[in-house]
């Protein structure tokens, strides 16, 4: 029986003075170990999702930690029968998740994490539940009673927040996204604007599904993912009918 492919997603908001200098080092390590996927680098940190053997993806993760001098990394690992990525790319970006808001300090303004085991009970008591993902993702699946901002890109989310200031004012706000990184920025944005009670699902939808198996059926549908699987079911297996056919 062949070894399953590990899919590792990791992000960290850590100051990187010269992110471009990391590109050849990460490409060298990743390609040598037959790792595939995408790693985004910027001065605000890194955000990557890549696949390979369990040993190989963890070696790339350790290289990322070493090069950025950080241990504070949000990590998620699951498995697949084949690579969901076709090659390794390491890219330099202005932001590791593009919101297009200048001078937003994610480490200064932070929403409060809600653990996956507490999420179901928590969202049944909250005033506002916001799905921070894009409309095409929400259409595939979302939590019951969640608000869909109907954005086409994450850069449109700040405008939605401004347009819905009265809806959000003085409310307890619960937010969620696929793997957690967009919620780091969206909750930071709301906190920086003066909203006090802002919370988000730790580890995102993927961690929630792994930990809870959607036992209370508050999650409805599948979870859109940005690789060749396109969507995963409650058990994180590729959702039927979504796998991207390769040419």
Curated annotation (Swiss-Prot):
SUPFAM superfamilies per the UniProt record, alphabetical: Rhodanese/Cell cycle control phosphatase
Catalyzed chemical reaction(s) = uridine(34) in tRNA + AH2 + O2 = 5-hydroxyuridine(34) in tRNA + A + H2O
Q: Which Gene3D superfamilies match?
A: 3.30.70.100, Rhodanese-like domain
Q: Where is the active site?
A: 177 (cysteine persulfide intermediate)
Q: Which GO terms describe its molecular function?
A: oxidoreductase activity, acting on paired donors, with incorporation or reduction of molecular oxygen
Domain Rhodanese: start-end pairs? 123-217
Q: Give the Enzyme Commission number.
A: 1.14.-.-
Q: Which InterPro entries match?
A: Rhodanese-like_dom, Rhodanese-like_dom_sf, TrhO, TRHO_N
Q: Which GO terms describe its biological process?
A: tRNA modification
The entry's keywords: Oxidoreductase, tRNA processing
This molecule's function is given as: Catalyzes oxygen-dependent 5-hydroxyuridine (ho5U) modification at position 34 in tRNAs.
Q: Which family does it belong to?
A: Belongs to the TrhO family.
Mind telling me which HAMAP family this protein's record contains?
A: TrhO
Protein name, as recorded: tRNA uridine(34) hydroxylase
Gene that this polypeptide is encoded by: trhO
């Amino acid at each position: 029986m062949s070894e399953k492919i590990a899919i590792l997603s990791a992000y960290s908001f850590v100051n990187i003075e010269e992110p471009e200098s990391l590109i050849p080092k990460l490409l060298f390590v990743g390609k040598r170990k037959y790792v595939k996927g995408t790693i985004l680098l910027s001065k605000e940190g890194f955000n990557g999702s890549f696949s390979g053997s369990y040993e190989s993806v963890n070696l790339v993760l350790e290289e990322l930690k070493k090069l950025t001098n950080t241990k504070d990394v949000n990590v998620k690992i699951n498995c697949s029968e084949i690579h969901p990525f076709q090659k390794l790319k390491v890219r330099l970006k202005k932001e590791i998740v593009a919101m297009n808001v200048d001078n937003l300090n994610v480490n200064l303004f932070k929403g409060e994490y809600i653990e996956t085991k507490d999420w179901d009970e928590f969202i049944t008591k909250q005033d506002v539940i916001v799905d921070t993902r894009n409309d095409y993702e929400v259409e595939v699946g979302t939590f019951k009673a969640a608000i869909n901002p109907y954005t086409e890109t994450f850069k449109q989310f700040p405008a939605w927040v401004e347009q819905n200031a009265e809806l959000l004012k003085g409310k307890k706000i619960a937010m969620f996204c696929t793997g957690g990184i967009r919620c780091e920025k969206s909750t930071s944005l709301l906190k920086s604007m003066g909203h006090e009670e802002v919370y988000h699902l730790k580890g995102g939808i993927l961690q929630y599904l792994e930990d809870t198996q959607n036992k209370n059926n508050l999650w409805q549908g599948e979870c859109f993912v940005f690789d060749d699987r396109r969507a995963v079911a409650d058990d994180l297996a590729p959702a039927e009918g979504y796998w991207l056919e390769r040419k």
